[in-house]
Amino acid sequence: ATDIKDDDFVDKLFVANTHDWLLCFTSNGKVYWLKVYELPQAGRNARGKPIVNMLPLEDGERVNAVLPVRKFEEGQYVFMATANGTVKKTPLTQFSRPRASGIIALELREDDYLINVEITDGERDVMLFSSAGKAIRFKESDVRSMGRTAAGVRGIKLDDGQKVISLIIIDEEGKILAATENGYGKRTKVEDFSPQGRGGRGVIGIQVSARNGKVVGAIQVADDDEIMLVSKAGTLVRTKVDGISVVGRNTQGVTLISIDKKDQLVAIDRVISGDDEDEEGADAVEEGALEEGAAADEGAVDEGTAEGEE
């Protein structure tokens, strides 16, 4: 387990070989490449190196997703979602030619940013969760495959002031855990979210009110998972998922964490257990809460743009 700072935690652990790639997707819609062997090798108790110091990020650019890739195979896709409700699916093979300065993975409109990226097989169900508590579940096949320069298509219709806060690739065995800024949350069965066509307004995933506040996160969890709750003031609370109520969609949830009136919940995530062991012949790559940072070099300019669809 990594010896981490008091205000940080491990939320993802990848088992990777030294020659595997790490695709680092940023809020600006760019992707950068790292080889696993480029990461500093250290003992189990070492803190590691901030990823922002290893990539030529622009001022304010954040790494929002890291995908480990062993082979760039046909039939696999990179699925992306933005805060303004745009989604895009691009063949993984289109990310097989690394550039030191990075490339554009998604052409973003003004005031939009990339929130998350996942690798899929093209046959999964996708869920988007908004800050207003709305959730939409649709077939991944509803999103046609596009090149890197395309702007994507509408995944969910949002009202003014609303943002997509979570992209989830559905696992039928899991449950959806949603949490709000005033410390409330709940679990809901995946089957309670019926698939519909992409681009709609979705259904109520959790009731939002002055009492519980806007949604700050939604993740898929198993009954034996643990999660970390992070407040704006820096409070971290670790809790077991099986102690959180499983209720229907149209409810507000229960108290997950006691929040001071001047504080807010800002993030939730699954926590990787410190007892997880490395696989033989492979390295464990840990991704914690990534820090914001700046770099001097500008990224590569992609060739042309394509208008998005609705």
Question: Model-derived features: where do they sit?
Answer:
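Short, structured "edge-of-domain" segments at secondary-structure transitions
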Residues: 1-310
